Amino acid sequence: CKSYEESLKYVSAEKYISFGGLLEYYGFDENERIGIAEKYSLELKQDYDVAALATNTQLKTIYDNLCEEIKQKSKEQDELLLQYLLQNKMFGKVGIVDIGWKGSMQYYLETYLESHNMDVSLMGFYVGILPNKTLHGETHGFLYDTNDHELRKKVLCFAGGLERLFQSLEGSTYGYRKEFGKIVPVLNAYEYAGSPEIQKCISKLQDGALDFVKENANCSIDDKKLAYKLVQFGVSPSLKDVRLFSPFYNTDGTCLLYTSPSPRD
């Protein structure tokens, strides 16, 4: 990156990002993040408005001070990712599966593959997809896509709940490293590691979803009709439905509960 402003172009589209999240974005591991936060007397959990990052002079100063280290980490990860894709024989037509929404993952992967002259044609399969950038590969949304986005608003009303159906029970990938001659993903700390109740809920949700898929695998009913009850559950939940998600919280920045606890809770 030639500047601080340019370095921010791949930051997540979330409204807020924590200082720790920004340092992770720049490639610093947990111990490094703690050290940097202490050096600059900042809290790792302190949130920043993503839209205002480019004009934050304090963060720009920190970036300028760490710039060379960030560039070195970026080069190392770029090479490791390339080796990882080659190691896993990523050539020709490749399908990717994600929950979807704006198509950012497919866009950035396409950009990376093109920059390294890799002959790969991506096809994305999503719950719902309406890209906000031009994609070269194909996309298919089971509930909505560019050809039919009637259900988009209703689906996004329940985005947090739907994302739990795809929630891994391990940390997300934030880098790669070489281990015993192979390139392996480096996983972040699992966001619900200290919440066994939530882990149990996620497992039950996913088991139920898989059972539903198995039962309806050969069903001729349209995808949107099959998902009708799930969509309605998200748009017009009963109080009982809402309480199913009372233990859940959002970890993008400050911890926020999915639902407001009632006085008796």
Regions found by a protein language model. Give the residues of each.
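Amphipathic alpha-helical surface "interface" segments used
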Residues: 227-234
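Compositionally biased intrinsically disordered low-complexity regions
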Residues: 222-227, 240, 244
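Positively charged, amphipathic N-terminal segments that serve as targeting/anchoring signals
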Residues: 1-217, 237-254
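Conserved small/polar residues in nucleotide/adenosyl-binding loops
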Residues: 258-265
